[in-house]
């Protein structure tokens, strides 16, 4: 499945939730939906990340693709920006590490300039929320559906 298809699945889920969330009066139930959305978001990011790495490796060499698929089989949400750089991209060499860092920095600067928020902080927060909800059944106060 192309990595973009994973995002379409999440977009469909969010479209459904947009219609439902305003009808929920119970803050506890609303927080449960937010927690499940955080889990879904990180799952989508993880699947997309796996697809990008595996597709790249398969284009390079079939055996590298097999190795990469096995390597990424159990990353289980370990997809923070630092982990992507240090545990995953670094294995492919400095050229790709620099390219990733440049791309992330350009995106971060553009979003900060146009939206006034950090895409990296937002991304990291979603992972934190997912971990809190998945492992402890609770969400930080900073996590809301809005």
Question: Which positions does each model-derived feature cover?
Answer:
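Generic structural signal for well-ordered, non-transmembrane alpha-helical segments
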Residues: 8-11, 15, 39, 43, ...
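A structural signal for well-ordered alpha-helices, especially hydrophobic packing surfaces
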Residues: 14-21, 48, 130, 134-137
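Short hydrophobic interaction/assembly module
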Residues: 15, 50-68
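Short, hydrophobic, well-ordered secondary-structure elements
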Residues: 31-57
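Short, intrinsically disordered, charge-balanced linker/junction segments flanking boundaries
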Residues: 144-146
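Charged alpha-helical initiation segments
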Residues: 1-36
């Amino acid at each position: 499945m192309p990595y973009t298809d994973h995002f379409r699945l999440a977009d469909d889920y969010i479209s459904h939730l947009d219609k439902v969330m305003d009808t929920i009066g119970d803050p506890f139930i609303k927080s449960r939906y937010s927690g499940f959305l955080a889990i879904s978001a990180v799952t989508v990011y993880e699947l997309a990340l796996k697809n990008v790495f595996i597709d790249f490796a398969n284009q390079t060499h079939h055996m590298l693709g097999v190795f990469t698929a096995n390597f990424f089989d159990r990353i289980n949400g370990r997809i923070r920006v630092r982990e992507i750089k240090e545990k995953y991209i670094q294995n492919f060499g400095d050229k790709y590490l620099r390219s990733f860092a440049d791309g992330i920095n350009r995106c971060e600067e553009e979003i900060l300039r146009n939206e006034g928020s950090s895409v990296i902080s937002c991304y990291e927060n979603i992972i934190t929320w997912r971990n809190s909800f998945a492992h402890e059944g609770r969400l930080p106060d900073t996590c809301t559906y809005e």
